[in-house]
Amino acid sequence: MQTSMSPVYLPSLSERHFRRIETTRRPCKFILAGLGVASLAAFGISAHAADYQPVHCAVHAAYVGSPLHAPVDITATPPVPNKALPAETTRRLDVTYERIQAFTAASAITAAVAIPGKGLWQQTSAPTDAPRLFWASAGKTFTAVVILQLAEEGKLSLDDPVSLWVPDVPNGDVATVRDLLAHTSGLFSANEDLKAHADPRYRDPAANLAIARRHGAMFCPGGRWRYSNTGYDLLGEIVRKVDHRSIDVAITTRIIAPLGLTSMRALVPGGGAVGVAPLTAVHEKPIDPSWAGAAGPIVSDAADMTRFWAALLGGRLLSDGTVRTMARKLYPMFDPGTYYGLGIMVFDVTDDSRSIRWIGHAGGTPGASAVVAYSPSDNAIVAVALTGDAVSVPAANLLLKALGPPK
């Protein structure tokens, strides 16, 4: 079952649109330019064990959730040349960046707008000894790309049961690698455990899986959609077993080094975050970015993030067919207008009475917010990451609007 675009309004610039909304019982909720997305350790929602009864499933379930989005066609984009955008465009982006800095009051921020085939604008304000920013769940796309590369190489199948690679996973004989990528496995996300959330320390994938086992599966694989950071933990473990290297080494070897992304780094899970702008939050103690593991492994400036997405959309990391597969089956997420495929998000929104579609990924955790997205109507890739209690999506929208009317 499919549905047409479900619009969400992207408001104009005002200070309140950059601020998170605090809730009484759930960790913290942001306004993503009108998109209310709950956040806990990079997109999670606080849950109690009593919220559901664990299920044991013998077969993969038919999807019974809210209507799917129609497949989104991803057209290959040319590379981004290493040159500046026209002077007037650069001036407008610079002015917009200054406004964003003032409204967000971010202690560190990096932003970039890349136009494939034309050029790049970028600005970063960060400590000189910590110039990289944390991209939180926007780094999930990197983990997904490695898994999809391994599938193209015939080293695994997206339809492999998870139990083929990782033992003792709830419904692991039924849930597939594809389910982990799409968040349809039913696997409990360990960061939703209230006791674990209150215990600020690194937990490796085995510890997170133990928490997920204790809670049990939330639904039969394929039957519904629910975000699971632990599912991406398991994808990192699958990479380790199939590719014989950790997720950080696999991302570096397969993506960062070949593309020459000199500012970008894949963090060693639990290995600390030296050289990364400190996360700052008023109401909740931030995590060490390296604790996110395969669920959010990337630190970088915004320019390299746009270069990665240009390479992905341009077929330089995966075949065009595989890239299209990432947006073929799109599940509705937390809010109207947001959908999830295989390691990517689709945003369908409205702004000033015009429809906007973004293809990318957002991320958030206490003390950091990030988004990277390709806007087909603008033929541009925008990326923003910042620290503090503000949010990144309104900033990204303002930067795209500074380019002028959509093409």
Predicted regions and their residues:
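Active-site-proximal loop and beta-strand segments within enzyme catalytic domains
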Residues: 72-80, 84, 103-107, 115, ...
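Boundary at the C-terminal end of the N-terminal hydrophobic targeting segment
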Residues: 47-49
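Short, well-ordered beta-strand elements
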Residues: 369-388
